[in-house]
Regions:
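Hydrophobic scaffolds flanking metal-cofactor catalytic centers in soluble metalloenzymes
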Residues: 1-197
Length: 197
């Protein structure tokens, strides 16, 4: 069982931006709920996106963000939140409503739910395909398993699941790509799957 220090999601009216900024600077994630639009206010570590923040953006399917240049939120990341995702992040805020701090430590044990293998786009690195070839599994680099997307090679998915997923098990676990190995416990996808069980 591993302890994971993860951000707490909170919702704020834009009139209380100072509270939201303090929450985010302490490591949390904020949902700013304006009358006409909603946006996320997220931490930045000297221009870099913290790992669990990046995974939250991937889980939501949002890629674009701006770094706030001036004012109290200067240096933080601002992400437009489409209407279709509002209910989703509000679920996260509701889940985290009982936490008084901006970060929470959770003891997480893998429940083998395979959420890390669902609804994720796995980019391959050249080392992954080299490892497959070295292990006599060069066919894993073929069209049945890999496709091109935006100039990158990625694992194929079938009905939202990784092509290598067998039930809740990885069919190539010992040879899985480096990005699969790096998937963090405590990501929003992981936490959501745990809450549903």
């Amino acid at each position: 069982m591993d302890d994971v220090l993860r951000p707490v999601w909170r919702t704020y009216d834009p009139r209380f931006e100072a509270n939201a900024v303090a929450h985010v600077r302490a490591g949390g994630h904020a949902v700013m709920r304006g009358a006409a639009r909603w946006w996320l206010l997220l931490p930045s570590d000297e221009g870099m996106i913290p790992e669990l923040t990046a995974w939250a953006m991937l889980d939501l399917g949002v890629g674009g963000f701006d770094e706030v240049e001036s004012g109290p939120a200067a240096g933080l990341l601002r992400v437009k939140l489409p209407k279709r995702l509002r209910e989703h992040v509000m679920d996260w805020c509701e889940r985290d409503g009982g936490h008084a701090t901006s970060l929470v430590s959770e003891a997480l044990d893998c429940r083998a739910c395979a959420m890390c293998c669902r609804k994720n786009r796995v980019q391959l690195e050249p080392e992954d395909e080299t490892r497959w070839a070295d292990e006599g599994r060069a066919e894993l680099s073929g069209e049945a398993y890999v496709r091109e997307s935006r100039g990158r090679r990625v694992l194929r998915v079938l009905r939202g699941d990784c092509v290598h997923l067998r039930g809740n098990d990885c069919g190539i676990y010992a040879l899985r790509p480096d990005n699969c190995r790096a998937f963090p416990a405590g990501s929003e996808g992981c936490l959501s799957a745990r809450a549903e069980r």
